[in-house]
Regions:
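Extracellular glycan-recognition regions
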Residues: 1-201
Length: 201
């Protein structure tokens, strides 16, 4: 994936080589300590409504990552033109396989809807249906598959036959269309490769 095909939105994008493969590196460059913000690399000239997004992603912690960093990495989709609305799904690798805290393990992945319905909004109200456990770790390639159909989103990890998370009613309007992005959050050095997009409409 060439960095020229991506637009920085509070991020810095570069091409790197991992295991002899050219990949896209994304780190935050703005809103550094703010959660669940519009911090992503946005695919230029993409217009996505319904379809399938598949990508492989790898997360590392930056040297200056705070203690609460979890390796946040994922996707944004249906991003509107001025980056003020989008849907998103991301994972927290440090809450995965190596985590021995049962509470943290319940927070392995997250759906959120920008700008209002962030993880903090859900946590404050005791809403847990947008999270689940994950069997993943830092510094390993994670395969993500997102199936988006009108108001429903279904997310799979590592080619699992069963979905990791099903969102029956996404929060923004089901007619919303927009760009696709690679989402990154606090303290994460994010890498992406092998993007495949299947458009249903």
């Amino acid at each position: 994936m060439k960095k020229e095909n991506w637009k920085e939105n509070y991020t810095h994008i570069s091409n790197e080589v991992i295991d002899n493969e050219k990949v896209l590196r994304v780190v935050k460059s703005g809103k550094i300590n703010e959660y669940d913000e519009n911090t992503y690399a946005k695919l230029v000239d993409s217009s996505f409504h319904n379809g399938i997004i598949e990508v492989k992603m790898l997360s590392r912690l930056l040297k200056d990552a705070p203690d609460f960093a979890r390796g946040f990495i994922g996707i944004a989709y249906r991003i509107n033109e001025d980056d003020t609305k989008f849907e998103s799904f991301y994972v927290r690798p440090t809450n995965g396989r190596q985590c021995d805290d049962p509470v943290r393990k319940q927070h392995g992945c997250q759906y959120f809807s920008y700008p209002t319905y962030t993880f903090a909004y859900f946590r404050e109200r005791g809403i847990t249906k947008y999270e689940n456990q994950v069997d993943i770790d830092l510094n390993e390639w994670i395969s993500l598959k997102a199936v988006i159909e009108d108001e429903k989103a279904t997310f799979y990890l590592n080619d699992g036959p069963q979905p990791l998370l099903v969102v029956d009613q996404m929060i923004h309007d089901k007619s919303m269309r927009g760009n696709i992005g690679f989402f990154v959050d606090i303290g994460t050095e994010a890498f992406f490769k092998d993007l495949k997009i299947t458009y249903f409409d």
